[in-house]
């Protein structure tokens, strides 16, 4: 089956997804049909890109908005005269982890719930996403230079797929919170939960045998664990009495996600700049195609004169 077929469709379903093991330690070798392997997305998809930069935007989504933002970012990168930073982009339902490819230093960790839009600028072979800042409510557009158009498409579809899974986790967390609040009001316990083991009522959680706590403690990249103070740790693991693992979702992140959801065409799906034709094209690709040169034969840095 084509490698990106499931990414272009309705993606992975829950709650069966929550029963899959999350091997949070090492990144496994990418299978040929990676989108048909649920554990691969849960573990995290890794892409090698070049970071163009960031600019602020006024709205959480929009094709023209993102195109203009990317144009500003590219112009700034060209004017700087510096070589682009090689980065590793890891995408999972938890979010995007950005690290320096040379030093393995953590650059940024963005929760998937803060991302409002992503797109692939086909002519420029650029992947870009818009996310709400962790420090304030400003919206940032980050752009990355890909080796070819098909990679930009693959990253875009992967982020959209991860968002779909994360949204389902969020729905579970909301339902779990409502059950606990109702049980608290009635003075009773919800079957299958232990009130002395759960977070406070101000915290939303998603439960299920999602991942092994010991594995989660192992950073996916060696330096990520050393830089956890710089990471957005709004999602934290907790263990219930039935050995299920909990995703905590603090009120600030919950509010940000709810607000961004209102701006989406479909609250359950991350808006992308891909057309049906783009998605169909991406569905015909496999990871082995990413290493093949484009028919144009131009090196990407030559196109941008970097």
Swiss-Prot record:
This is Low density lipoprotein receptor adapter protein 1. It comes from Rattus norvegicus (Rat). The keyword Lipid metabolism applies. The [DE]-X(1,2)-F-X-X-[FL]-X-X-X-R motif mediates interaction the AP-2 complex subunit AP2B1. Keywords: Acetylation, Cholesterol metabolism, Cytoplasm, Endocytosis, Lipid metabolism, Phosphoprotein, Steroid metabolism, Sterol metabolism. Residues 178-204 are annotated as: Disordered. Its main location: cytoplasm. Adapter protein (clathrin-associated sorting protein (CLASP)) required for efficient endocytosis of the LDL receptor (LDLR) in polarized cells such as hepatocytes and lymphocytes, but not in non-polarized cells (fibroblasts). May be required for LDL binding and internalization but not for receptor clustering in coated pits. May facilitate the endocytosis of LDLR and LDLR-LDL complexes from coated pits by stabilizing the interaction between the receptor and the structural components of the pits. May also be involved in the internalization of other LDLR family members. A motif (Clathrin box) lies at residues 210-214. Interacts (via PID domain) with LDLR (via NPXY motifs). Binds to soluble clathrin trimers. Interacts with AP2B1; the interaction mediates the association with the AP-2 complex. Interacts with VLDLR. Interacts with LRP2. A motif ([DE]-X(1,2)-F-X-X-[FL]-X-X-X-R motif) lies at residues 255-264. Residues 44-168 form the PID domain. Residues 247-274 are annotated as: AP-2 complex binding. The gene is Ldlrap1. The modification N-acetylmethionine is found at residue 1. It comes from the Eukaryota. One of its GO terms (cellular component) is recycling endosome. It is found in: Cytoplasm. Changing residue 55 to M: 10-fold reduced affinity for LDLR. The modification Phosphoserine is found at residues 14, 197, 200. GO terms for molecular function: amyloid-beta binding; AP-1 adaptor complex binding; AP-2 adaptor complex binding; clathrin adaptor activity; clathrin binding; low-density lipoprotein particle receptor binding; phosphatidylinositol-4,5-bisphosphate binding; phosphotyrosine residue binding.
């Amino acid at each position: 089956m084509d490698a990106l077929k499931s990414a272009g469709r309705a993606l992975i379903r829950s709650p069966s997804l929550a029963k899959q093991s999350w091997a949070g330690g090492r990144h496994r070798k990418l299978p040929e049909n990676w989108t048909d392997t649920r554990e691969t997305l849960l573990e995290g998809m890794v892409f090698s890109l070049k970071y163009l930069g960031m600019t602020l935007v006024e709205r959480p989504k929009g094709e023209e908005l993102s195109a203009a933002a990317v144009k500003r970012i590219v112009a700034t990168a060209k004017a700087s005269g510096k070589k682009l930073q090689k980065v590793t982009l890891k995408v999972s339902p938890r979010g995007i982890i950005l690290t320096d490819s040379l030093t393995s230093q953590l650059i940024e960790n963005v929760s998937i719930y803060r991302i409002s839009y992503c797109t692939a600028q086909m002519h420029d072979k650029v992947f870009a996403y818009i996310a709400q800042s962790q420090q304030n409510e400003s919206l940032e557009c980050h752009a990355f230079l890909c080796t070819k158009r098909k990679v930009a498409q693959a990253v875009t579809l992967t982020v959209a797929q991860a968002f779909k899974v994360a949204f389902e986790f969020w729905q579970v967390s909301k339902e779990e919170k409502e059950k606990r609040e109702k049980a608290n009001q009635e003075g009773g316990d919800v079957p299958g939960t232990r009130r002395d083991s759960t977070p406070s009522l101000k915290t939303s959680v998603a439960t299920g045998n999602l991942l092994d706590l010991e594995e989660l403690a192992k950073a996916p990249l060696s330096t990520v664990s050393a830089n956890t103070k710089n990471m957005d740790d709004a999602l934290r693991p907790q263990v219930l009495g039935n050995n299920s693992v909990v995703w905590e979702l603090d009120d600030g992140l919950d509010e940000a996600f709810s607000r961004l959801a209102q701006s989406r065409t479909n609250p359950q799906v991350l808006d992308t700049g891909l057309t049906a034709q783009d998605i169909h094209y991406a569905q015909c690709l496999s990871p082995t195609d990413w290493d093949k040169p484009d028919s144009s034969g131009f090196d990407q840095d030559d196109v941008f004169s970097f």
